[in-house]
């Protein structure tokens, strides 16, 4: 394709709010253009990359007998009400109303819709298992879209849904998908690591995320250097081994602590280590207030709270709610309280006595507070995030951290949707049973960004061969010169029989062409310049920067060999 005919609006400067390298490079190289916050158009080069990614995805889905369909993005509220997610999903669900007053959602996911499609069709165990997938735009009303395609309000996904008669069948498909995802990410050029994860709003009993390692990743991966253990930090268990720091029990004392609001400020004020301070936070669980205690150097993990209480309806109490409840602001909270409120404490709070806590009065704290004498803990549990260097739950060693971008996730849903939506089949005994389900997602547009995050240098993108928008970049330095133009035209015709070629025939300066070529990042560059009359051209590899002069008689052989050896 001639570059003069392709819309590639490269930029010299990018908006300052473009933080991620992938966002900056996708804008700068003319692959995407922002419409509004979190919404982008995919321009010709990006569209070609997306087509290459989806071709690989389709191949791997068909390899495991997953069948492609296409469902509507617009979903009626009644389906979401059946599953209970219309009210539970939260503000991220994009809702709208038609002219007749009917409620709809622009789908962030399609569990309800696909269940409604199959529930009156998959009637017998003989029709199972069945796996369906689609590739489609999804929608999520992100509060703060950021990092370009990594956290947008409209995005492209591959989502698959499987239906089974028994758990063994689900296990097999889950494993098939897990392996297919591993192959997909390897083929598209991403270093992705599967990690144990939380199922979030989708639900289910078992799930893995596939994380593309990246410094700008919004998720923290906890992993072992001694085993294959890897988990999202939200899911990583903290091993509790008692390590008591007890001292002689002292009388309870109330002290003035002016302008002290954080655990670290309190530790500094008292001249004590922050891990000897106990923080108190108030949450609402299904509308009921509870207190949660952790030590000063630990942070409460609300995902673990949701898992512990078995509900997604958990939120941190607002400042106004806290003041109305206890008469003090959040920085002054403590468990010594004359109100009926359940108190939950992280396991590691048990290692301390003579606690330092808030007095439920602004400007004051209590010291020498002791469980059993001054207050009672209803239950202890693992309610916090793991720290780097702590022991891992598999016993393999200690926790190490890395950042990652979630590019895919696989879920065992069980009967969460089939039971609520009455999707049943007859088993081999003729009894009605709820369909057992799995769901499996890949962020296609996220994958595009993740590829760029992991495959770039100071000059631009470096596309892996499997997804590159074009195989070769043919550049005529000066098309006004007959010998250069004629040789470039001839090479373009020849190479087009075997490769996808982007032919830079523009009337631009050589520096502009070379800068754009580096920015766009095609794997191999062929430059027709001042030695065209001798039949000599330059061949350059984008990844290594290695270049050599080659006579046109040998050019096809050289290019073919280099291309075959590309990653």
UniProtKB/Swiss-Prot annotation:
InterPro entries in the record: aa-tRNA-synt_IIb (IPR002314), aa-tRNA-synth_II (IPR006195), aa-tRNA-synth_II/BPL/LPL (IPR045864), Anticodon-bd (IPR004154), Anticodon-bd_dom_sf (IPR036621), Pro-tRNA-ligase_IIa (IPR002316), Pro-tRNA-synth_IIa_bac-type (IPR004500), Pro-tRNA-Synthase_IIa_type1 (IPR023717)
UniProt keywords, alphabetically: Aminoacyl-tRNA synthetase, ATP-binding, Cytoplasm, Ligase, Nucleotide-binding, Protein biosynthesis
GO biological process, one term: prolyl-tRNA aminoacylation
Highest taxon in the source lineage: Bacteria
GO MF entries: aminoacyl-tRNA deacylase activity; ATP binding; catalytic activity, acting on a protein; proline-tRNA ligase activity; transferase activity
Principal subcellular localization: cytoplasm
Record function comment: Catalyzes the attachment of proline to tRNA(Pro) in a two-step reaction: proline is first activated by ATP to form Pro-AMP and then transferred to the acceptor end of tRNA(Pro). As ProRS can inadvertently accommodate and process non-cognate amino acids such as alanine and cysteine, to avoid such errors it has two additional distinct editing activities against alanine. One activity is designated as 'pretransfer' editing and involves the tRNA(Pro)-independent hydrolysis of activated Ala-AMP.
HAMAP family: Pro_tRNA_synth_type1 (MF_01569)
Protein name listed in UniProt: Proline--tRNA ligase
Species of origin: Staphylococcus aureus (strain MSSA476)
């Amino acid at each position: 394709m001639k570059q003069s005919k392709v819309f590639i609006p490269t930029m010299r400067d990018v908006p300052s709010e473009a933080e991620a390298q992938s966002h900056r490079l996708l804008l700068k190289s003319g692959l995407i253009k922002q419409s509004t916050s979190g919404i982008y158009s995919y321009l010709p080069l990006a569209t070609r990359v997306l087509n290459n990614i989806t071709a690989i995805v389709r191949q791997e889905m068909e390899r495991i007998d997953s069948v492609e369909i296409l469902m509507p993005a617009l979903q009626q509220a009644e389906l979401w009400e059946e599953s209970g997610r219309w009210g539970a999903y939260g503000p991220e669900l994009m809702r709208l109303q038609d002219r007749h007053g009917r409620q709809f959602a622009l789908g962030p996911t399609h569990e309800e819709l696909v269940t409604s499609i199959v529930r009156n069709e998959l009637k017998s165990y003989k029709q199972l298992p069945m796996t369906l997938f689609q590739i489609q735009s999804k929608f999520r009303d992100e509060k703060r879209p950021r990092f370009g395609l990594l956290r947008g309000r409209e995005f492209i996904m591959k989502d698959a849904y499987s239906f089974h008669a028994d758990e063994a069948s689900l296990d097999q498909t889950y494993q098939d998908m897990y392996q297919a995802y591993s192959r997909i990410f390897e083929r598209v050029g991403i270093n992705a690591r599967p990690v144990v994860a939380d199922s979030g709003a989708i639900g289910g009993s078992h799930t893995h995320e596939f994380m593309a390692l990246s410094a700008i990743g919004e998720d923290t991966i906890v992993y072992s250097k001694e085993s294959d253990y890897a988990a999202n930090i939200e899911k990583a268990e903290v091993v509790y081994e008692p390590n008591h720091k007890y001292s002689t029990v002292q009388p309870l004392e109330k002290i003035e602590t002016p302008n002290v609001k954080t655990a670290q400020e309190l530790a500094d004020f008292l001249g004590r280590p922050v891990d000897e301070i106990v923080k108190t936070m108030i949450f609402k669980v299904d509308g009921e207030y509870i207190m949660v205690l952790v030590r000063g150097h630990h942070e409460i993990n609300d995902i673990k709270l949701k898992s512990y209480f078995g509900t997604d309806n958990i939120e941190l109490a607002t400042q106004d709610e806290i003041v109305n409840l206890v008469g003090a602001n959040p920085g002054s909270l403590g468990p010594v309280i004359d109100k009926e409120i359940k108190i939950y404490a992280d396991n590691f709070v048990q290692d301390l006595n003579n606690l330092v806590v808030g007095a439920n009065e602004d400007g004051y704290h209590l010291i020498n507070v002791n469980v059993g004498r001054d207050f009672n803990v209803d239950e202890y549990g693992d309610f916090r995030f793991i720290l780097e260097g702590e022991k891992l739950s598999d016993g393999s060693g200690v926790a190490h951290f890395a950042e990652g971008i979630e590019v895919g996730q696989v879920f065992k849903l069980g009967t969460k949707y089939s039971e609520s939506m009455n999707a049943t089949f007859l088993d081999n005994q003729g009894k009605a049973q709820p369909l057992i389900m799995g769901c499996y997602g890949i962020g296609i547009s996220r994958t595009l960004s993740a590829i760029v995050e992991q495959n770039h240098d100071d000059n631009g993108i470096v596309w892996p061969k499997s997804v590159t928008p074009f195989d070769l970049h043919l550049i005529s330095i000066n098309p006004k010169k007959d010998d250069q133009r004629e040789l470039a035209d001839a090479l373009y015709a020849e190479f087009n029989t075997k490769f996808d070629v982007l032919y830079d025939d523009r009337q631009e300066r050589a520096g502009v062409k070379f800068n754009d070529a580096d920015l766009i990042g095609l794997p191999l560059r062929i430059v027709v310049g001042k030695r065209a009359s001798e039949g000599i051209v330059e061949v350059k590899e984008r990844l290594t920067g290695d270049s050599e002069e080659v006579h046109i008689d040998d050019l096809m052989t050289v290019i073919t060999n280099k291309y075959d050896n590309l990653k």
